[in-house]
């Protein structure tokens, strides 16, 4: 069965120390996302939690471009709709204490065709990417709050 969302409560025993560690890192990587990121900091224990949670029964390369990276964003960072065409799953772990209720991650459907992921049609996918900054072309279908 394909799951859309998996929520893991209390992911870290001491999230405050992880947050302190994250804030002490160098943030210099920017890309197709708001804010800035660090180099990856994947640990064996985090890898095991993720592997067990999403039932990975094959070897997965956690040494990829962003696995385990910390990302720093502020209220001033502009967000947009985007997808990663080569990614089968994504994980987001919030470390902001007392975050505003409006923070979190939204999931959208492209109004033209109802797509929630890339189609595999290069021309259509390029068009969808081109529309990523025009929120009138998207419908928010759900949101995962920063709690």
Which sequence ranges carry the predicted segments?
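Non-heme Fe(II)/2-oxoglutarate
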Residues: 1-81, 104, 111, 127
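Catalytic core of non-heme Fe(II) oxygenases with the double-stranded beta-helix
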Residues: 73-147
């Amino acid at each position: 069965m394909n799951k859309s969302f998996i929520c893991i409560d209390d992911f870290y025993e001491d999230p405050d120390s992880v947050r302190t560690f994250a804030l002490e890192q160098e943030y210099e990587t920017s890309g197709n996302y708001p804010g800035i990121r660090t180099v990856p900091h994947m640990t064996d224990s985090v890898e095991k939690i993720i592997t067990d949670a999403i039932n990975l029964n094959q070897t997965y390369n956690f040494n990829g471009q962003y696995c385990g990276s910390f990302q720093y964003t502020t209220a001033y960072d502009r967000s947009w709709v985007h997808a990663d065409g080569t990614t089968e799953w994504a994980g987001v772990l919030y470390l902001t204490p007392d975050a505003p209720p409006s923070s979190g991650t939204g999931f959208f459907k492209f109004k033209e065709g109802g797509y929630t992921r890339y189609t595999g049609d290069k021309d259509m996918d390029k068009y969808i990417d081109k529309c990523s900054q025009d929120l009138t072309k998207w419908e928010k279908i759900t949101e995962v709050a920063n709690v």
